[in-house]
Amino acid sequence: MTQNSSSLGDRIITPYTPPRSQPMNKHLFVSLSTLFQTTELDFANKKSCFLCLPLRADGFPEMPHSPAQTERMQKLAKDPPHARSEDVPDHLFFVDTAGLREIVCFCGVLSLRTSEGLMRKETA
């Protein structure tokens, strides 16, 4: 995974390139509430409301997780199509990285540019 963020004032742009060693549709996990200080993600495009940011090349977030959280993450990874955001503890979301192109945070608005278009979420 290549993840180089550039900052211009309050604007943070993070291009996302899937790692060659992982399948394009590998599901990665992270706590969005930790990254963006928000506890809700309700994108207008409900079809793609499970987008999140991978933090490390192995797909796991930097922050430590309890054994129970890790187990729930592993279960979701095995069967992601049936997982819903409200079923995931601690605001943990998943993403099919095949569609993720760019992550932009500007003036409290999180924008995720995907192959399906641009989605936004007020984070402040």
From Swiss-Prot:
Residues 72-85 have a biased composition (Basic and acidic residues). Residues 63-85 are annotated as: Disordered. It comes from the Eukaryota. This is Putative uncharacterized protein C1orf140. It comes from Homo sapiens (Human). The gene is C1orf140.
